[in-house]
């Protein structure tokens, strides 16, 4: 569940989430290694924080393209709270930094962050920026500050232990108007640092506690939004994908008389297509 709202006479907006269940679901569906769980988990958490600020027909996608072991991460959210994502490759050997923590910067390497906003019009808006960190939260912060010119503070975290995902969560704070006094900004920055790492804070506190710690009585309004890892794939869409094959390829499948498996990249669900279904597709192509 995401909690969002406004503070400081609507000069500041915020969104916070305990995304543990979301990240656990993604990790299980894709059968990820620890460091890929952390990478995808952070991006999923970051995109989930944006759900309250999406319009009805909006689809928001974050894409990270890396140059090292982690090549590609994608996360997508819609206004209805449905979030999905995937990472390539799914299994990567753990890389740690001098503090013994997951080193996403090294695992991802140099690369780009693309923010894709599909407003339901003909062409989505795509904004690419270079990764400045690879730790994801810092890269999203840089994007909002530079590309959207909204001063932002973002914390994202995924805590892993021997049993898997222990805790995941995130928070974003955005200053919507430059008339907010400097002393208030300084106070927000100070309080924000006190609740990070966000996963450590959420181990003993709730997302509401994080908001109260930062804003106190300055909070003016809060709302809640359900968040679920839910894909829009279906058996019918799997059939549609086979229609892209050439006639000769479809004939070859029919000759083998085997069930065809089509996997969704977003959620790793596998759909089994029967030979007679492939025959129907071929018949339609030959009409």
UniProtKB/Swiss-Prot annotation:
SUPFAM superfamilies xrefs: Hsp33 domain, HSP33 redox switch-like
Keywords, sorted A to Z: Chaperone, Cytoplasm, Disulfide bond, Redox-active center, Zinc
Post-translational modification: Under oxidizing conditions two disulfide bonds are formed involving the reactive cysteines. Under reducing conditions zinc is bound to the reactive cysteines and the protein is inactive.
Subcellular location: Cytoplasm
GO biological process, one term: protein refolding
GO MF terms, alphabetically ordered: protein folding chaperone; unfolded protein binding
Main subcellular location of this protein, as a coarse class: cytoplasm
Pfam families recorded: HSP33 (PF01430)
One CC-aspect GO term: cytoplasm
Disulfide cysteine pairs (residue numbers): 231-233, 264-267
Family statement drawn from the similarity comment of this UniProt entry: Belongs to the HSP33 family.
Role, per record: Redox regulated molecular chaperone. Protects both thermally unfolding and oxidatively damaged proteins from irreversible aggregation. Plays an important role in the bacterial defense system toward oxidative stress.
Protein name (database record): 33 kDa chaperonin
Biological source species: Thermosipho melanesiensis (strain DSM 12029 / CIP 104789 / BI429)
Gene: hslO
């Amino acid at each position: 569940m995401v909690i969002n709202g406004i503070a400081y006479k609507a000069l500041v907006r915020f969104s916070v989430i305990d995304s543990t269940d979301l990240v656990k679901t993604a990790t299980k569906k894709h059968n990820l290694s620890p460091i890929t769980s952390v990478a995808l988990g952070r991006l999923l958490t970051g995109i989930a924080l944006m759900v309250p600020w999406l319009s009805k027909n909006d689809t928001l996608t974050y894409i990270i393209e890396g140059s090292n072991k982690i090549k590609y991460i994608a996360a997508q959210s819609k206004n209805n709270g449905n979030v999905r994502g995937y990472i390539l490759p799914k299994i990567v050997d753990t890389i740690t930094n001098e503090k013994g923590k997951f080193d996403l910067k090294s695992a991802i390497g140099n690369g780009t962050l693309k923010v894709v906003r599909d407003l339901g019009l003909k062409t989505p808006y795509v904004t690419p920026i270079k990764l400045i960190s690879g730790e994801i939260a810092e890269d999203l912060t840089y994007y909002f500050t530079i590309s959207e010119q909204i001063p932002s503070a973002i914390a994202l975290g995924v805590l892993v232990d021997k049993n898997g995902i222990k805790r995941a969560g995130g928070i974003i704070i955005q200053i919507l108007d430059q008339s907010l006094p400097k002393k208030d900004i300084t106070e927000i920055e100070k309080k924000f640092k006190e609740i990070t790492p966000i996963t450590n804070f959420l181990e003993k506190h709730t997302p509401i506690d994080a908001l109260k710690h930062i804003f106190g009585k300055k909070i003016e309004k809060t709302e809640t939004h359900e968040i679920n890892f839910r894909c829009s794939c279906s058996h019918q869409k799997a059939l549609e994908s086979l229609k892209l094959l050439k006639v000769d390829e479809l004939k070859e499948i029919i000759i083998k008389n085997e069930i065809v498996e089509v996997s969704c990249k977003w959620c790793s669900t596998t759909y089994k297509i029967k030979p007679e279904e492939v025959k129907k597709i071929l018949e339609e192509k030959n009409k």
